[in-house]
Amino acid sequence: MPKHLLIVESPAKAKTINKYLGKDFTVLASYGHVRDLVPKEGAVDPENGFAMRYDLIDKNEKHVEAITKAAKTADSIYLATDPDREGEAISWHISEILKERGLLKDKPMQRIVFTEITPRAIKEAIQKPRMIASDLVDAQQARRALDYLVGFNLSPVLWRKVQRGLSAGRVQSPALRMIVEREEEIEAFITREYWSIHAECTHPAQHFSAKLIKLDGKKFEQFTITDSDTAAAAQRRIQQAAQGRLHITDVTNKERKRRPAPPFITSTLQQEASRKLGFTTRKTMQIAQKLYEGIALGEEGSVGLITYMRTDSVNLSLDALSEIRDIIARDYGTNALPDKPNVYTTKSKNAQEAHEAVRPTSALRTPTQVAPYLSNEEHRLYELVWKRTVASQMIPAILNTTSVDLAAGNEHVFRATGTTVVVQGFLAVYEEGKDNKNAEDDDEGRKLPVMKTGENVPLERILTEQHFTQPPPRYTEAALVKALEEYGIGRPSTYASIIQTLLFRKYVDMEGRSFRPTDIGRAVSKFLSSHFTQYVDYDFTAHLEDELDAISRGEEEWIPLMKKFWVPFKELVEDKKDSLDKTDAGSVRLLGIDPTSGKEVSARIGRFGPMVQIGTVDDEEKPRFASLRPNQSIYSISLEEAIELFKMPRVLGEDQSQQVSVGIGRFGPFAKRGSTYVSLKSEDDPYTIDLARATLLINEKEEIARNRIIKDFENSQIQVLNGRFGPYISDGKLNGKIPKDREPASLTLEEAQQLLINTGKPARKNFSTKKTATKNETRKQTTKKRTTDAKATKKVSDKPVKKQIKKRIAPNITQ
C-alpha cells in the first residue's frame, strides 16, 4: 500500500509525476481550485475583519472526496500544486478541508514546489519540503476579496444605470479603458497628406533607390510637401539640377551589435505566440500547460517538455545553462558561444516569486526530435520556446549599416541606406517579432553597391509618392498584453483571463486580430471613467498590484489594505446608486430633432443593445425604437442615419393575398407574411431586399414545416415528425425514438404513446403547429406519464439522492 499522498492540480501532471515516484506514492489531482467564495452577498464580510465564506466547487467535490479517502491511509501528505499564489492558495484550501475533517492530527503535511516536471526536480522538491507560505495565501485572498467586492458592488450599479447583466472587474475595467481610449484616438485622428521623393539610380553593379533628405538647401521634413502640385514642381527642380546624375558627397559605414532577446516570461511568450503563430493568449496558455504537464514520448512515457509557464523571471538554472551551451557548441560551433552565459534582468514592473524563465526542460530534446509526438500547434509553440531559449545564450549579431549621400546640384540631397549581417550570432536560430515595422527594418537585408566619395552615379528617374498619415493601430492581443505589463496592471496568471472576460462579456469584438470596443463596452467604460475614475485609473490599479506584491513578500498585512480600499469605495457606490440617471451614465447620446414629428432623437443602450429612439418617456405618445444596423455605433451615427432606421418595417407588397414586409427585431432582420416569420440570410440586406427574395425565403420555411409532419393523430397532441436525425415522436413536451424496423407513417396512437413512455426525453422546443389538446386529453396523457414516473422513482428509491439547493443568481465577479 502506498505510504505517501502527493496532491497536484491536473490529472496530466499527476500521471507524469506518478511515473517518476513509484509505488510508495499515490499522486492525485485536485482539478484546479477546490473551494470558492459562496456566490451570494456576504461572502466577504467587511464588518467582520473581511472574513471569507467558502464552499466546495460542485464539479470538484468527487476529487476532494478521493483526496480525503487517500489521506486517511497515507503516512504523509505532500502538497505539490503550482509554484505561485494561486497554487499556494489551492494547497491552503486542501489543507483546511483535511484539517476540518480531522485527518491531520497524526500525520505530517508539507508543501513542495518545482518549476519543471522532471525526475530530478520532483525528487529534489521532496527532499526540501516547507510549510504553506501564509504570505502568498494572504496575497491571493486579498486579490480574491478585492475582485469580489468590486464585482458584487459595482456590477449592480451598471445594471441599474446602463443595462442589466453587465459586470465590472477590478483589472478588466482598466484594460477595457485602454481599448476604448485607443478607439477614441482613432476616431479623433485627422488624416494629413504628405509626399516623399525618391531617386532611382543605375549603378553598374546594381540598381538602388535613395530618399530625399534635403530640398532647396533645407532639411526635407515629413510635411514639407503636402500636395501634388508642389511635389511635381520639386521633381522638376531636382531633375533640372541633377542633369541625369547624382554626385556622391559622403559614404559612412557603421557597425552595431544586436543582442538576443531574453528567454520567455509569460507576457513575452504570449506576445510572440500572437505575432509569430497567430495564437490567442488563451490558446498559448492552454498549449503551454500541456507541454508543462507532460507529453507521451513513445517508450519514454509522459515527459514535461517546458518549465512552468506563469513567471516573471528571466533566469535560467545552472544545469539548464550548461546544457544549452553544449547544444550551441555542438550545432552552431564554439564561435557562437559567448565567453560566459548571458545574464538578463526582468523588465517587469513587479516581478513575483522567483521562478525560472519559460524554457525547455532539456535543450537536448530538439523540436525535430519531439515533433512525431506533438500536435502541429504543440510543436510550433515548443519550437518557439526552444529557439528563443537557445538564442538567448548566443553571441550578438553584428550588423553593418552603409549610408551614402548623393547630391543633385548644390541644393538637393538624397540618402541611400543598406544593412547587412556581418556575423549572424543568435540570428542563426531566432529573431524576435515586432508589432510595427520601422525604416530600419526596411533597410535590413538591403545591399548597396560599393561606392566612393566623389563618384557620380547615373540617375534613372525621380519618383514622387503620395502618403497619408495613419491613426494609431488598434490593440492586438500581443500589444495589449505588452501595455498591461508596462503599466503594471495584472500578473502572468491574469492576462489571458482579462482578455477572455472582455470578449465573453461582448465588451470588445475581434476585428481581424485587433480589438474593437462594442457600444456596450464603450458605455461601460465611459460610465466607470466618469463616475468611478480612481478605480479604472492605470496608476491606481498598478499601485494596488504593488501592494498585493508587498503582501506576498510579507512586507504588508492584507486586512489594512482591504480597509483602505473598501471604506471610500463603498461610500462612492452608495452615492452613485442614488444620484445618477441613465443620461448621466453616458449611454444616451442626443442626435437632434426629427423633422416629421418635431421630437427628440437619441442613440442609446437599450434593454436588448444599441438602438435609436424618437421621443421620450415623458411624451404623451410612446417613444419609437429602432435597432442599429451591423457596423453602426451609437457614438458615431448621425441624425439622418438614425431617421433612416425608422423606415422599418418595409412593406414589399402582397403575396397570396397577404402583406409581405421586412423588419429588424431583437434577433436580427426578418421577413414576414401573415403569421410566418423567417430570419434573413447573412447576404440579405433588409433595406434592399425585394418581394421575390422575401417570398422565396418564406416559402422555403413553410415547405420545411409541411414536410416535417409525417403523421397526425385525431384528438391528440402526439405527432410523428421528421427531424434532423430522422423520424421521431413528440407531444410537444417529450420526444421519443422510433425503432429502425418500424415504418413511421404506420404507427398507431397507442404505439406512439407507448414509445413516448419508454423512450421519451424532454423536448428542447415545441415546434408543433397543432392547437392545444383538450383538458380531458391532457389529463389522460398526464396520468399515464405520472404512473410511469412513479414506477421509476420506486425502483431507484434505495439509492442516495444528492440534495439540490436553489441558489440566488449573483452578479458576475471578474478580474
From Swiss-Prot:
Q: Where is this region: Disordered?
A: 759-815
The protein's enzyme class: isomerase
The record's section on CDD domains has:
TOP1Ac, TOPRIM_TopoIA_TopoI
Binding positions (Mg(2+)): 9, 82
Bias type Basic and acidic residues, positions: 774-801
Which cofactors does the annotated protein need, by name? Mg(2+)
Give the Enzyme Commission number.
Answer: 5.6.2.1
Q: Name one GO biological process term.
A: DNA topological change
Q: Which PROSITE patterns match?
A: TOPO_IA_1, TOPO_IA_2, TOPRIM
Location of region: Interaction with DNA = 167-172
Site description Interaction with DNA, residues in chain: 33, 143-144, 147, 159, 310, 505
Task: Give the catalysed reaction(s), semicolon-separated.
Answer: ATP-independent breakage of single-stranded DNA, followed by passage and rejoining
Quote the catalytic residue positions.
Answer: 308
Listed transmembrane segments: none
Mind telling me which InterPro entries this protein's record contains?
Answer: Topo_IA, Topo_IA_2, Topo_IA_AS, Topo_IA_cen, Topo_IA_cen_sub1, Topo_IA_cen_sub2, Topo_IA_cen_sub3, Topo_IA_core_domain
Reply yes or no: does the keyword Metal-binding apply: yes
* Subunit structure, interactors included: Monomer.
Q: Which HAMAP family match?
A: Topoisom_1_prok (MF_00952)
Q: Which NCBIfam families match?
A: PRK08780.1, topA_bact
Q: Which family does it belong to?
A: Belongs to the type IA topoisomerase family.
* Record function comment: Releases the supercoiling and torsional tension of DNA, which is introduced during the DNA replication and transcription, by transiently cleaving and rejoining one strand of the DNA duplex. Introduces a single-strand break via transesterification at a target site in duplex DNA. The scissile phosphodiester is attacked by the catalytic tyrosine of the enzyme, resulting in the formation of a DNA-(5'-phosphotyrosyl)-enzyme intermediate and the expulsion of a 3'-OH DNA strand. The free DNA strand then undergoes passage around the unbroken strand, thus removing DNA supercoils.
Name of protein? DNA topoisomerase 1
From the broadest rank down, the organism's phylogenetic lineage runs: Bacteria, Pseudomonadati, Pseudomonadota, Gammaproteobacteria, Lysobacterales
